[in-house]
Amino acid sequence: MADVVTMKQLLEAGVHFGHQTRRWNPKMAPYIFTQRNGIYIIDLQKTIKMLDDAYNFMKTVAEDGGVFLFVGTKKQAQDSIAEEATRAGQYYVNQRWLGGTLTNWTTIQSRVKRLKQLKEMSQDGTFDVLPKKEVALLTKEMDKLERFLGGIEDMPRIPDVLFVVDPKKEKIAVHEANILGIPVVAMVDTNTDPDPIDVVIPSNDDAIRAIRLIAGAMADAIVEGKQGQDDESVEVDFKKNADGSEEIVSAEENPED
C-alpha cells in the first residue's frame, strides 16, 4: 500500500518543524531527527509510518460504523477541524472544550437539546411574537450554544475515537477520553507528552498547512472506511417454508451509490 502522504507533501506543509529545543518533552526524543538553529526537526520517516498506522486505524473503525470527534480549538486548527470533520460526516469541537463533554454526556445532551429548541423557535415564528429584549437574550444564548456545541449537535452518542490537534492544549479532552477508554489519535509536537495518546502522529501542530494535511488524511480514512462499509452491505431474500421456517434463497451485494 502506498503511503498516505508523501515526504514532499510533509516537507511542503512544514510538518517537520518542532518547537524550540528548550521547550521540549524528553518522551518525544524517539521521534526527533535532529536540531537546527535551536529548533527540533521531527523524523518524517517515523511520521509517515505512524500516519499510515493512524489512517488504517481510522479506516477500520469507520468500516464498523464508528463515530469520530475531531478536536482542535487553537486558531490555526479551527477551520480545518470543522471542514474535515464535516467532509467525513463526523463531528467536531473547534472553539472551547466544555469540561464534561464526554464524561458528563447527559448534561451536554441537555444543552444540545436547548440549542435545537432555540433554533426551532427562531425558525417557526416564535421569535416574531416575543418582546425584542427577550429575543435578544434568546439569540445571544443560541449563538453561544451554537459556537460551543454546533459541531456535536447531531452526534448520536459518545464517540469511538478522538482525533486531536495539540493534545497539550486539549489536555482536558484527552483526559476525559482516557477515563472512558476512548482511543485518541493525535498530532503530537516535540513539546508534548505522548503517553496519553493511543496513536501518535509526530508533527508540527502549529502550522495551518500541516494541520490541514493531516486532518485531511484522517477524514480521507473515514470516508474510505465508510465506503467499504457500504460496499459490503448485501441484500438477502428469504423464502418461507410450509413449516413456518425461513431460508435464504439469494444474497447479492447492493450496487454502489
UniProtKB/Swiss-Prot annotation:
InterPro entries: Ribosomal_uS2, Ribosomal_uS2_bac/mit/plastid, Ribosomal_uS2_CS, Ribosomal_uS2_flav_dom_sf. Residues 226-257 are annotated as: Disordered. Signal peptide: none annotated. Residues 244-257 have a biased composition (Acidic residues). CDD domains: RPS2. Keywords: Ribonucleoprotein, Ribosomal protein. The keyword Ribonucleoprotein applies. It comes from the Bacteria. GO terms for biological process: translation. Pfam families: Ribosomal_S2. Transmembrane segments: none annotated. The keyword Ribonucleoprotein applies. PROSITE patterns: RIBOSOMAL_S2_1, RIBOSOMAL_S2_2. One of its GO terms (cellular component) is cytosolic small ribosomal subunit. Belongs to the universal ribosomal protein uS2 family. This is Small ribosomal subunit protein uS2. The gene is rpsB.
